[in-house]
Structures are given as structure tokens and as C-alpha cells.
Amino acid sequence: MRALLFDPYCGASGDMILGALIDLGADLEYVRSAVESVGCRLEVNERRFDHIRAIRVKVISDKSFRSLGGAIDILKASALTSRALERALRILDIMASAESKVHGVDRENARFHEMGSLDALADIAGSCAAMESLDVKRILSIAPSVGGGITDTSHGMLPVPAPATLEILRSHRIPWRGGPVAHELLTPTGAAILAASVDTFLDHHPEIVTERVGYGAGSREIGMPNLLRAILGEIPHHMQHDRVVQIETNVDDVTGEILGSLIDMLMKEGALDVTVVPAVMKKGRSGSVISIISRENDARKLSAVLMRETGSLGVRVFPALHRLIAERRIESVEVMGRSVPVKIGSIGGEIISVKPEHDVCRRIAEELNIPVKDIIRIASEKGWRIAGRKID
């Protein structure tokens, strides 16, 4: 599978991402037209950092904007295709949501701390055009470095990571690390592009057969090569993998009603899966083994919920389990005038599973007063037809 891997060992900004993608071989004519269509001019230059060649892009514009609505209008009028535009609007939405949350204002009045001019918007449009032109099936990233210290923004002096950047990392559950220097390395624009584009964040480099390597140069002097590395290549196996934590505890004094509500609560708090298995405890007592699959950064929170709700005095945590998972995507099918999400699973282009969202099927069945199994059957049949047309 053709994949793009970002390696933000020195963070990421919009211009660094754009430069790295151009260096990888993105269609420069399409990228330039995307940037120019939002009212900017693109300069592409080659630079060297300690004998490492990199692409430094500079976006030139004397126009400015502040409102979300204005930015949306500019993007919609741009030269981006519908696919690239969808990603660009998603990036903008992520940034607006973060600024709104941090500053306590509504989204339309959110003030983008990087966007005194159109530079960041041009970086977004150019990066989306570049990623589309590279035509990859999967985008991965190593956990980004954010830097440290204090940074000067249009909101004043702020700690690193900047509040908007940190909110993006939090809301999208992106793992990150501090350092390696006391500068702002990961900007809100860079974080938002990664959040909207990356399918999986990793702690270390995956198994990949490298085709090309690109370097995007940052504008600041930070005492080390200020570069973002991007790798284009083939992932030799088609199952994805990630790192999860397994949390367990045994209980013998918890009712079925409490266990049912506990499962719902854990899933709402971010658990990936929860199972309850009947067991025979010491002294022949009947009980249950509660097992939770969790992301690493959610383990402490979910352990606290488990202990608080069951009264358990301790839990077992099995860290850093490697989970192999099939590729998954969500498509929508129409059933009797209603939209039903269908999860399609595949390995190496071979479809292995098509499952309609049960809760949606049940709701439609109740509205139309027909058996839920009929809704599931119709949605499944349509899902398989869609899946067959879209095999890579």
C-alpha cells in the first residue's frame, strides 16, 4: 500500500509540511495554482542545513482576514478539487474549534493567532493540493515534537505548545513530546493539518519500503536543522497496527445493572472496547472479569472510572500491547430514504467485512415500524456493492 509518513522530529508548520510534500514530488503546478487562487504568491527555494538539502517555501500576500466565514469563502472559491477542498475545510474547522474553545468565543468570532495574513490559509490550500497529487492510500505520522519555552503570537506571549495547538492535540488525541529545543516547533496550522490528514500516529517508524524522502524547511533559526521529514513508500503488509493498553479487574459484588451502565460510561469516556466475562473467584464465589482496551493516554482516566464505579481497590494494567487491525472506512448508503453509515473492513484491497451501524438501523426500524433485521440486510447489501466498486 502506498503510504505517506511524516516524521516531525522538529515539529511541523504549514510551510514546512508544504515544502516537504513539494520535495517528495507533489504536482508543483497544481500546488501553485491552489496557493494563487487564495490570493497569494508562492516562492519555492532550495536550502541546506548541515549539508541536508531541503525545500523552503514562502507565501507572499499583503491581504488579511480574521473571520471564519471569510476564510471559508476564500477556500470555496479556490482552485482546489472537491476532495482537497473537503480536507482544507476540515483543517480550518479544527483551527476554529480550538481557538473558540481556548478563548471562550463563538466559532465565527474566533481569532486565528497565526492568521494576520493569508499565509496560513495558503499553506492549508497548498498542502491539501500536494497531498491529493501524491495519491497515497494511507497517511501516518510519528508523534510530533512541540518544542518548549515561550512564543510570541498575535495574542501575546504564550507558553509552548500554544493553547490552540494544545487544544488540537487534546481534542484529536494526538500523542506529542516536548523539546528538543526551547522554541515553538508545532504551530496550530501544522497541528491542524496533521489532525485532519493523518490516519495513525506512531511512537516509532513503521515497516516501510522507502520510495522518496522529502525535507521541508522552517523559517526560524533554532540551533539545529529546522526540518520536517516526509517519507513516501510502500507499507509491505496491509494490516495497520497501533499501541493500546489493556486494563483488567475482578469483581464479585457488582450487579448486572451496574455492569451495563459501567460499559456505557467507559465507552463514552474513550474506551476502545469493554468486555465482561463470568468467572469463578476464590472460595467458589461467582464474579466477573472486566477488561478494557484503551489508548495509552486514556489508561489512567479509565482506570479511575473503573475503580470508582465498581469499588475495586486496584486494577491490572498491561501496557504497550500491539494491536493489528484491518483497514477501515465509513461509507453511507440510503435505505428507505434514510442514510445509514456502513463500516467497511479490508486487508490489502480485499473486503472482509461490511457492517451497518446498528443503532442507526434500529432507529430507522422504529420510525418505519419494520423489523431491524430488514434494515440491516438492505444496508449490508448496498454496502457490499459500494465496497466492491471501491476496492483499491
UniProtKB/Swiss-Prot annotation:
One of its GO terms (molecular function) is lyase activity. Keywords: Nickel. This is Putative nickel insertion protein. Belongs to the LarC family. It comes from Methanothrix thermoacetophila (strain DSM 6194 / JCM 14653 / NBRC 101360 / PT) (Methanosaeta thermophila). The keyword Lyase does not apply. InterPro entries: Ni_insertion. HAMAP family: LarC (MF_01074). Gene3D superfamilies: mk0293 like domain, Transcriptional regulatory protein pf0864 domain like.
